Structures are given as structure tokens and as C-alpha cells.
Amino acid sequence: MAVQLFNEQGYDATSVADLARRLGLTKSALYHHFASKEELLAVALEAALGGLEAVLDQPGAREGAASDRLRFVLTGATDVLVAQLPAVTLLLRVRGNSAVEQAALERRRVFDHRVTALVAAAQAEGGVRDDVDAAVAARLLFGMINSVVEWYRPGGSVDGDRLGHDIVRIALDGLRTA
């Protein structure tokens, strides 16, 4: 619920009193569990970043042809986004205004570099087109994936379990039938 409030009002505009009210706690009860509002932010960002980093550490991301590993990572990242939608939404909105946000942005950069290296490996193997810069391709792929936070609604008409497959299919295979 704290993450939803951060997403609704913005992290900087959300006070500890706002959080306590939304959670049905007193401020002192909230401080009993979390030392600061920034600690709540860190917990939320960890849910998103930890999930994304875990995808890169799975065997499907480390073994086999680079294009297969790329497909695995893109599908897995979409699955994390669906499972951790509020936390990933928050992650995509941080701007580096605090030490916690700066650390999160650095972890995102490392993740982005690892995905870019995977795209480059897939290009080198001939598994994906190589006439697009690997860093640009990685950013475009994640632009598609990250856009999900703007339109996907759990329980809506789009099947969250299938979403990763559909995004990767369009991103890597296109819309053409032939």
C-alpha cells in the first residue's frame, strides 16, 4: 500500500503521516517497523530490482544460444513487471533525488548493460539482426516492456501470464506472418 501511495502522489510528496494514514497505523507504529520513509522506498525498489537481477542469474539467462537467453530474459523481466507492478512502476519513476534512488538507478544501469551485452552476443551469433546498435536495441526492447506499467491492469482483459510471451514475440519476431 505504501508503494501505491508513492506512485499516486510521488515519493517526495508523500509524508510519513500520509503513509501511516493509508496503512491504518500511527506514525510511531510505522517508525517501529521502518526507520524512515526512505527505508520503505528501499524495500519497494528491492522487490523490483531483486526480481529483475534474479532473472539474469537463472540458468535460462546464462546457458545456451544468446538469442534464446535474450528471449528468456525479456520474458522473465516482463513476468517480474507483472508480478511486482507497483514496485516496478515506482522504480521507473525514481530520478536520483536521494541516496536510495541513486543506488537503484546504478543497479538499473548495471542491468541495462548486462542486457545490452546479451543483445550484442545474440547479434554476434546471428540470432538477431545486427544493423541496429545493441544499446539502442536493448533500450527499445525495454521501452516496450516498461510501457506495460502504463496500460496493464491485473485482472483486466490482458492475460498477465501470457504477456511476456506476447511482448517477446512481437519484439523479436515482429508482426509479419511470413
Task: Identify the function of each model-found stretch.
Residues E8-D12, R62-E63, Q84, E125:
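Short coil/turn segments at alpha/beta junctions that flank glycine-rich nucleotide-binding fingerprints
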Residues M1, L5-E39, V43:
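Helix-turn-helix
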Residues V43, A54-A83, A134, A138-L141:
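Hydrophobic alpha-helical connector segments
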Residues V80-A83, L90-R93, A117, A121, ...:
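Amphipathic C-terminal alpha-helical segment
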Residues F72, T78-A117, A124, Y152:
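Short secondary-structure transition hinges
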Residues A61-G64, R109-A137, Y152-G155, L175-A178:
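Hydrophobic alpha-helical bundle segments that form small-molecule/ligand-binding pockets
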Residues S67-F72, A103-R107, A124-L140, V158-H165:
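All-alpha amphipathic helical-bundle segments outside canonical DNA-binding/catalytic cores
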